[in-house]
């Protein structure tokens, strides 16, 4: 039986097949997310001028400082100072009173050319569709029929809470808000022959950075009335739902002043909130030849297409690659028993409908466009504006 960590019995979970699952999200001003957004802003700046740019840009931030480091081969002329400062300004760190200021922070640049050893085996003297994977690795795509987006409800709601918080901050409705925030949602589920059905929300956790002028009680009321009730469907909330709103009691010091930030440290927030699986590779700051990103997007496209076609209710797709090799080494399909077809039959459907070479993925998903800064907060999946979220009509 699933239950609280203290071992107290939760009778709502006594029914066979009941369990709880938790996912978290972070806001734009979280230090790791600042770095993700800067890395993707740099990628976009190159792609706007050079769609064939090879970019691997990492970012580090701490109080009053941003470091760009990595490898970039591009004909674009990019003003890194401006890109970094514009990104921080958009996020909302525009005053030293908030702990970080785009106008005064120091921007250090340590960017080099892509290794010629990598270039010669991946893309030099190759047709685009024969471009090799930029590295070895394994990537996963996941989809579930529990929401319209084919995403887990836990991560969908965690992202929506953060999005709502940012909207209330930018509109001035809650002027005491600052850019850093974290949310966490625990949902009680029932299993249904391998599929999962959300029943109710067990717990919601929200922590938001704030100014000195607001009381804890006022913050808690605003978060419940103007954030949670505006985002979470009432059918999932009941008198037993637990709320931890500003559980630390005080969160004035946030962003890079509170913690150092690094690109690629929120890979579970970026994907499925702990559902499915993760191969370990981060997304932000990487062009399409980095299969950590492009193949993970393609695997999600495959997974969502299978669910939307009614071939399964829940699915995990794994792909793997070797550096310099265009064809994936393996493709694996796991349906948790939710399909009338065998996994071998589903693999035949995938092979008939999808070409998972990086040079074909980039064409099918239009990955040379400068769309990446938008992906860098509130999740890369479940958002209809991105091509990998448009299910392919399958022939089978």
Swiss-Prot record:
InterPro entries: ADOMET_SYNTHASE_CS, S-AdoMet_synt_C, S-AdoMet_synt_central, S-AdoMet_synt_N, S-AdoMet_synthetase, S-AdoMet_synthetase_sfam
PTM annotation: S-nitrosylation of Cys-121 inactivates the enzyme.
Record CDD domains: S-AdoMet_synt (cd18079)
One CC-aspect GO term: methionine adenosyltransferase complex
Cleavable signal peptide: none
Catalytic activity: L-methionine + ATP + H2O = S-adenosyl-L-methionine + phosphate + diphosphate
Record Gene3D superfamilies: 3.30.300.10
Cofactor: Mg(2+); K(+)
EC number assigned by the record: 2.5.1.6
GO molecular function, one term: identical protein binding
Positions bearing S-nitrosocysteine: 121
Entry binding sites for K(+): 58
Disulfide bonds, paired cysteine numbers: 35-61
One biological process term in Gene Ontology: one-carbon metabolic process
Residues at which Mg(2+) binds: 24
Region ranges (Flexible loop): 114-126
Keywords: ATP-binding, Disulfide bond, Magnesium, Metal-binding, Nucleotide-binding, One-carbon metabolism, Potassium, S-nitrosylation, Transferase
Pathway: Amino-acid biosynthesis; S-adenosyl-L-methionine biosynthesis; S-adenosyl-L-methionine from L-methionine: step 1/1
Role this protein plays: Catalyzes the formation of S-adenosylmethionine from methionine and ATP. The reaction comprises two steps that are both catalyzed by the same enzyme: formation of S-adenosylmethionine (AdoMet) and triphosphate, and subsequent hydrolysis of the triphosphate.
PANTHER family linked: S-ADENOSYLMETHIONINE SYNTHETASE (PTHR11964)
Name of the protein in its database record: S-adenosylmethionine synthase isoform type-1
Source organism (scientific name): Mus musculus (Mouse)
């Amino acid at each position: 039986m699933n239950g609280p960590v203290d071992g107290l019995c939760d009778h709502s979970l006594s029914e066979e097949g009941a369990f709880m699952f938790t996912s978290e999200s972070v806001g734009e001003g979280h230090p790791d997310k600042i770095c993700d957004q800067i890395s993707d802003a740099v990628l976009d700046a190159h792609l706007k001028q050079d769609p064939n740019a090879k970019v691997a840009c990492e970012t580090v931030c701490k109080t009053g400082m941003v470091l760009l480091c990595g490898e970039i081969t591009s004909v674009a002329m990019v003003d890194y100072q401006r890109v970094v400062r514009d990104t921080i300004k958009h996020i909302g760190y525009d005053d030293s009173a908030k702990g970080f200021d785009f106008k005064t922070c120091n921007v250090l640049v340590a960017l080099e050319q892509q290794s010629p050893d990598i270039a010669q085996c991946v893309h030099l003297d190759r047709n685009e569709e024969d471009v090799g994977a930029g590295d070895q690795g394994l990537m996963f795509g996941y989809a579930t029929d529990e929401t319209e987006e084919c995403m887990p409800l836990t991560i969908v709601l965690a992202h929506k809470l953060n999005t709502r918080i940012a909207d209330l901050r930018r509109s001035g409705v809650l002027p005491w808000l600052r850019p850093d925030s974290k949310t966490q949602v625990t949902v009680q589920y029932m299993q249904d022959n391998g599929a999962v059905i959300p029943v109710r929300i067990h717990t919601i956790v929200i922590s938001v950075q704030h100014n000195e002028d607001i009381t804890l009680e006022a913050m808690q009321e605003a978060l419940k009335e103007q954030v949670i009730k505006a985002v979470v469907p009432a059918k999932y909330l009941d008198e037993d739902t637990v709320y931890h709103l500003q559980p630390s009691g005080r969160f004035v010091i946030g962003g890079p002043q509170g913690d150092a930030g690094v690109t690629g440290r929120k890979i579970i927030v970026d994907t499925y909130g702990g559902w499915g699986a993760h191969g370990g590779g981060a997304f932000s700051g990487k062009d399409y030849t980095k299969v950590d990103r492009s193949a993970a997007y393609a695997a999600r496209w495959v997974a969502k297409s299978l669910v939307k076609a009614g071939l399964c209710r829940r699915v995990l797709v794994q792909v793997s690659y070797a550096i310099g090799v265009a064809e994936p080494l393996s493709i694996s399909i796991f349906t948790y028993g939710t399909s009338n077809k065998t996994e071998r039959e589903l693999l035949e459907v995938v092979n008939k409908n999808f070409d998972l070479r990086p040079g074909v993925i980039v064409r099918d998903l239009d990955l040379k466009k400068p769309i990446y800064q938008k992906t860098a907060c509130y999740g890369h999946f479940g958002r209809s504006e991105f091509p990998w979220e448009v299910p392919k009509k399958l022939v089978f």
